[in-house]
């Protein structure tokens, strides 16, 4: 399920922010900053995560 974020399909699996693994691929400095900011609340949600701006899903639960 590397291309899915819970029940949501992500077009780009690198946009899925998972607990303990907030960044898979860094394209630009701006992208890096956005991923880090999103990774903090996602990790605090106890395993719940959300996809990045490139993905339509926002409240996905990661396995």
From Swiss-Prot:
The keyword Metal-binding applies. It comes from Actinidia deliciosa. One of its GO terms (biological process) is intracellular copper ion homeostasis. GO terms for molecular function: copper ion binding; zinc ion binding. Keywords: Metal-binding, Metal-thiolate cluster. Metallothioneins have a high content of cysteine residues that bind various heavy metals. Transmembrane segments: none annotated. The keyword Magnesium does not apply. Belongs to the metallothionein superfamily. Type 15 family. This is Metallothionein-like protein type 3.
């Amino acid at each position: 399920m590397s291309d899915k974020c819970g029940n949501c399909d992500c077009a780009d699996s690198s946009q899925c922010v998972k607990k303990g693994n907030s960044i898979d691929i860094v394209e630009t400095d701006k992208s890096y900053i956005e991923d880090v900011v999103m990774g903090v609340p996602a990790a605090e949600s106890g395993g719940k995560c959300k996809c990045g701006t490139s993905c339509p899903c926002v409240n996905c639960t990661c396995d």
